[in-house]
Amino acid sequence: MNKLSTKLVVAIGIGAALYGILGLWGFSIAPNTFIKPALAILTVFGALFGPVAGLLIGLIGHTVTDTIAGWGIWWGWVISSGIIGFSMGLIQKRVGFSVKNGSFNKGDISYLAITGLVGIVIAIIFAGAFDIIVMGEPFDKIVIQVLGATISDVIVFLVLGLPLTIGLAKSNKKHAHLKIEK
């Protein structure tokens, strides 16, 4: 098993704290369902540090949100945040892609968009199924939550997460070619 570097552990801690605290704010769109801008944190940190970091940031951060909010930990939704973070981090495994160095192309952006959207859909369906099967939640309530959560997460991903990640990569590209003059 690969060891986690100190840098990666620190990034996971910072990402989880940001995701956990920012996850407390959102705009209600369905029963217990919110548009939460915090999802952009999973996109940026996943793209920067990879799928393992994205997974752990999602799991830890969502647990922090649920704990602080006081509504109990909803494990299906915690796991779904981990799945989303993992899917956002898959882009980091593409050869030649690097947010840190500003190295990306249209194919990378498409890949991030596709893996992000597929990850969101899989994660939210998992959370809904978990709530019905394990938590005994009513089917009709969960259908509304799943639809609302999917729509809200897709909106946040496309409007905030993807543009922030691309913007950060573009910004780093400008600075990657700077040289120290002697």
UniProtKB/Swiss-Prot annotation:
Gene3D superfamilies with a match to the protein in the record: 1.10.1760.20
| Entry's Gene Ontology cellular component terms | plasma membrane
Which keywords does this Swiss-Prot/TrEMBL entry list? Cell membrane, Membrane, Transmembrane, Transmembrane helix
Topology relative to the membrane, per the entry?
Answer: Multi-pass membrane protein
- Is Metal-binding one of the keywords? no
Q: For this UniProt entry, which segments traverse the membrane?
A: 9-29, 40-60, 71-91, 114-134, 142-162
Coiled coil: which residue ranges?
A: none
Q: Does the keyword Cell membrane apply?
A: yes
List the subcellular locations. Answer: Cell membrane
Family statement: Belongs to the UPF0397 family.
HAMAP family given for it? UPF0397
Record's protein name: UPF0397 protein BCG9842_B2659
- Origin species, per record, is Bacillus cereus (strain G9842)
